[in-house]
A protein has these predicted regions:
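Membrane-integrated ABC transporters
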Residues: 1-46, 66-72, 90-94, 123-162, ...
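C-terminal portion of ABC ATPase nucleotide-binding domains
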Residues: 502-503, 559, 576-624
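Primarily ABC-family ATPase nucleotide-binding module
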Residues: 249-254, 352-406, 486, 563-566
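Helix-to-loop junction immediately C-terminal to a conserved catalytic motif
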Residues: 426
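ABC-fold ATPase nucleotide-binding domain signature/coupling loops
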Residues: 437, 494-527, 536, 621-624
């Protein structure tokens, strides 16, 4: 998708920027105030110095009274020093608020992902859209980041125009004396009209040329963002990725990466970006700068001729020239800001396309009973499901009922629908056909958070965060330390926990602390299991719970898991069929359907069944 500056009207441009500004003020109140104040001081302080300098030059060119000269010098020094001091203070404040704004902007994105339906979150189109937003911001700050710039430029431009107008009025009202001869022609209204037309032309043409340059850049947005992804993946991120470093060294992947970076050539000589810089963008900006120089030259001639004719003193020359050129520059700044905003509007549109993704999953109002007897009955009734955008059914006509407090194993080949079954049970997705019932009621009628509270899940691709061990187990800042410690011991983490000097306060990983500890894949899996145990939900679901454990640790977990689970209903997904023997019931999935269901002994007795084939396929590697 190519971004075009002319894609949105001025009304739409201002509307979407007002919305963006409201959102930024909501998540970071007062965030724009230092930018406004800094812009006012930045724009106004030069005019004070210009006016004082003109008075000083007038005195130097006439009476040259020492006490008057000293007064003007002191005023110039004092005003300049005060302005610089004030700007330094405001700049500090501005930098602090800028960092806060950038951080809160990330909070806005994170909150959206957390509130979004998992089905939309998992959708590739959503991920691609968010990646595009990221690349736009990385490229040139497009999106929210430019709001700070627009506030600054708008206030600076308006303040500058008002200040310049105040200092320029007398240029056109003061007349050249009749004794000046031919120079009295400067009093003719046509000169005034001509100067004003020139100012208007430069003021309008300059921003138009700058807008043309922005438009040229925006047409390259997709290519530039792709180039950023290439550089981020192969140049910036790879060297610090220790998990990939062994493969990179062993298979000389750096050569492949270097070749790809050179082949893509988004930013190199002869690339579209380089050509745009040399042609449309470069020429547009050069012409804009040339027009400004022409205006300055004409104004200098006009002001000097009026001064030569005696309309005002020599000190006013610098005042008027600076004021007129600054007036034009600030007006151009305002217009170019509008052009820039029209370009940025398309990038904000992408952001709000993401932020406005609606939650379509039905939110029920019933509460799940907090049953002390944990008597929860779950039934899949003719459930069928396919992932968004897919024509293939991931699950088809699944019927199953859980026996409360029992152990259920789910087995099957890769892609048979095992993990999809768990996602539907946890209501990460809703089925297209059929119903999932909790105690006879469709789970969609329950409050979502309430329903989620009855499940503890260890997904195969679980994540631990760089925080203390106890916080990882509890999932909160405040927690029951004895309960967290017991969960870790039950999960088989006792020996490693005893070896940690800080115990539950041990920071995991070194991303945020040099004192952090690294844990192996098996140890991380034990922590994830402990996290599920700590939640103490009626249902505990383990997706490949021992995949990263060695056989001894696996045997230890399974040997005591019946005791650990207690009266909970436990559901396991496993490729190691030896782990299924301790389960009360086994469901065999194949191509999205449940084709067998029974105990280990019952299923193994069916020599023509899928379970028997899977069992013997694995058993041959453990027997001679």
């Amino acid at each position: 998708m190519k971004k075009k500056a002319e894609g949105m009207s001025l009304r739409e441009t201002f509307a979407i920027h007002r919305r963006a500004a409201r959102d930024m003020r909501r998540i970071a109140p007062g965030c724009f105030m230092p930018f406004i104040l800094c812009a006012v001081v930045e724009a106004a302080s030069p005019y004070a110095v210009i006016w004082l300098s003109a008075r000083l030059v007038d005195e130097l060119s006439t009476l040259r009274r020492p006490e008057i000269l000293a007064k003007w010098v002191l005023w110039i020094v004092a005003v300049s020093a005060a302005a610089e001091l004030l700007k330094a203070v405001l700049e500090r404040w501005k930098n602090v608020r800028s960092e806060l704004l950038d951080r809160q902007k990330e909070v806005l994105y994170t909150e959206k992902f957390l509130r979004m339906d998992y089905a939309d979150c998992d959708r590739q189109e959503t991920r691609d859209l968010f990646s595009q937003i990221r690349q736009n911001a990385d490229w040139s700050g497009w999106g929210f980041a430019h709001l700070k710039l627009y506030y600054t430029q708008a206030v600076q431009g308006i303040t500058g125009i008002l200040g310049a107008a105040a200092l320029t009025v007398s240029l056109f009202t003061r007349q050249v004396p009749t004794s000046a001869g031919k120079l009295t022609a400067l009093n003719h209204p046509l000169f005034l009209v001509g100067i004003l037309l020139l100012i208007a032309a430069v003021t309008c043409l300059g921003p138009a040329l700058v807008g043309r340059a922005y438009s040229a850049w925006n047409t390259l947005a997709e290519q530039v963002c792709f180039g950023n992804r290439v550089f981020s993946h192969f140049v910036f991120m790879q060297p610090g990725d220790k998990e990939k470093d062994m493969d990179r060294r062993m298979y000389r992947q750096s050569e492949l990466a270097e070749h790809y970076v050179r082949t893509v050539n988004i930013f190199g000589v002869g690339s579209p970006v380089a050509k745009a810089s040399q042609t449309t963008v470069g020429l547009s900006k050069a012409l804009a700068a040339s027009l400004s120089a022409v205006l300055s030259g004409v104004v200098y001639v006009f002001v000097c001729l009026k001064a030569l004719g005696g309309a005002f003193g020599i000190g006013s020359v610098t005042q008027y020239v600076s004021a007129v050129t600054t007036f034009s520059g600030n007006t151009a700044l305002l217009l170019s800001t509008v052009s820039h905003m029209r370009a940025n509007a398309e990038f904000l549109k992408a952001i709000y396309t993401f932020l406005d993704i609606p939650n379509s999953m039905y939110q029920g109002s019933l509460t799940t009973e907090k049953r002390s007897d944990r008597q929860y009955d779950v039934e899949f009734r003719d459930v069928s499901f396919r992932y968004p955008g897919s024509d293939i059914w991931a699950l088809r006509h699944v019927n199953m009922r859980f026996k409360v407090g029992k152990r259920l194993a789910i087995v099957g080949e890769n892609g048979s629908g095992k993990t999809t079954f768990i996602k539907l049970l946890c209501r990460l997705y809703d089925p297209q056909e059929g119903q999932i019932l909790l105690n006879g009621i469709d789970i969609r009628k329950y409050r979502y958070d309430d329903y989620m509270g009855i499940f503890s899940v260890v997904f195969q691709d679980f994540q631990l965060i760089c925080q203390p061990l106890g916080n990882n187990v509890a999932g909160s800042m405040e927690y029951d330390r004895d309960r967290a410690r017991k969960a870790l011991i039950d999960a088989g983490f006792a020996d490693r926990l005893a070896a940690m000097e800080k115990g539950l306060d041990t920071m995991l990983y070194k991303n945020l602390s040099e004192d952090g500890v690294e844990v192996s894949g098996g140890e991380a899996q034990k922590i994830a299991i402990a996290r599920a145990l700590y939640k103490d939900a009626p249902f505990i679901i383990l997706d490949e719970p021992t995949a990263a454990l060695d056989p001894i640790a696996e045997a230890e977990i399974y040997s005591k898991f019946d005791e650990i689970a207690g009266d909970k209903t436990a559901i396991y997904i496993s490729h190691r069929l030896s782990s299924c023997k301790f389960c009360d019931e086994i469901a065999v999935f194949h191509e999205g359907a449940v084709i067998q269901q029974g105990s280990h002994t019952e299923l193994l007795a069916d020599r023509g069944g899928k379970y028997y084939a899977l069992w013997n396929a694995q058993a041959q590697y453990y027997t001679e």
